[in-house]
Amino acid sequence: MINKRIIAITAVLAFSLNALTAQGRYEYGGDLAGGARNGTSSAVSLLIPQGAAYLTGGGAVATATGVGAAYWNPAGMARATNNLETTFSQRSHFADMSVLFAGAAVKLGNNSFGVSIRSLDVGEIPVTTVFSPDGTGEKFSPSNFTAGLTFSRMMSAKTSMGVTVNTTSEGFRRVKGTAMTFDAGVQYVDFLNVTGLDVGVAVRNFGRPMRYEGSGLLTKAVEVGTDRLTQFMKIEPAEFDVPMLFEMGLAYDVMPGLQVSGTYESNNFEQDKVKLMGAYTLPGLLTVRAGMLMETETVERTDDSRTTTVDESSSKVEIDNLYDGFSFGGTVYLQRYLGSNASIDYAYIPTGFSGFDDSSVFTLNVGF
């Protein structure tokens, strides 16, 4: 009889690769569009890492467990060490933005159920119009909110699978867009019977494009070729794909307390990435971590005179990830001090560009 666990891993892998191929990966509109798809998706907040324990994500797809796995790989939720877990995280983002993440998970036998929410606070933005390009004096605050439901199950003593359904809402003034996305993954502990070798595979943000609606898309205009007076007409916006990605990672316990891990990410809208992390744990006391994020290819964008009013065809701009490079963090375990299964995670993630604030992430975890 064929091993069901191998079938599960293969099925998720095949589904992920097929989905990426169907949506198309790298170019958006070919040469006329002038470059890659960076920044052209909807629901970009889905790409912001949640929680501090996994830094930029090195090996998280293989090692994330409990409620924190709701973002990285829903399969890990079934591997929680507590029957009830809660988490709350705050991340300082660049340009004075911030991200809040909260979640809870309950374990019932081999099954786990979880709920999570995340919100991106952009702050206030001045209102500008065609007739007031310098601003009207008003300000608005965009809204960006995601809620998710997760189901995870232990398929065997070493294999778990999970699915998350997310609903993301983006809005500004009188315009709003909503998208439903799905995450699915599998984790395997002691892969191929190698003690300490964990493997994980996940596809995230699979869903239909987001379309924006609302009265803010109405504008006053006169229909050409008619005798009609000025009337309201609706601007039909284009659909924007969600930023689907595929991750495959592994982690290995080199020695008691020392783990090294890595993840390969194939992203539908950005360059592919490699994420690495090393962690050393003193049981019951603390864990220290160091991570690294790097892109597998260099992309240069050339502006095309056929798609811009300014001829900049001779200038090339290299597209880099804001968080390329090293990151650091750790966890302090509070059980011996508080008597409850609680911990605090911290991550420091520098940006690679001057003028952008580095990110600091704090996470409080409590288990019962």
Enumerate the language-model features and the residues they cover:
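Short strand-turn segments of transmembrane beta-barrel domains in outer membranes
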Residues: G59-V61, L84-H93, I349
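Acidic, small-polar-rich N-terminal luminal/periplasmic segments of exported/outer-membrane proteins
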Residues: Q50, G57-A60, P74
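Outer-membrane beta-barrel porins/channels
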Residues: Q23-L55, V99-F368
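Bacterial N-terminal signal peptides
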Residues: T10-N18
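Bacterial N-terminal signal peptides that target proteins for export
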Residues: M1-I9
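N-terminal periplasmic accessory domains that precede
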Residues: G68-R79
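A short, polar/charged loop/turn motif at coil->beta-strand junctions and beta-hairpin connectors
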Residues: G51, A80-N83
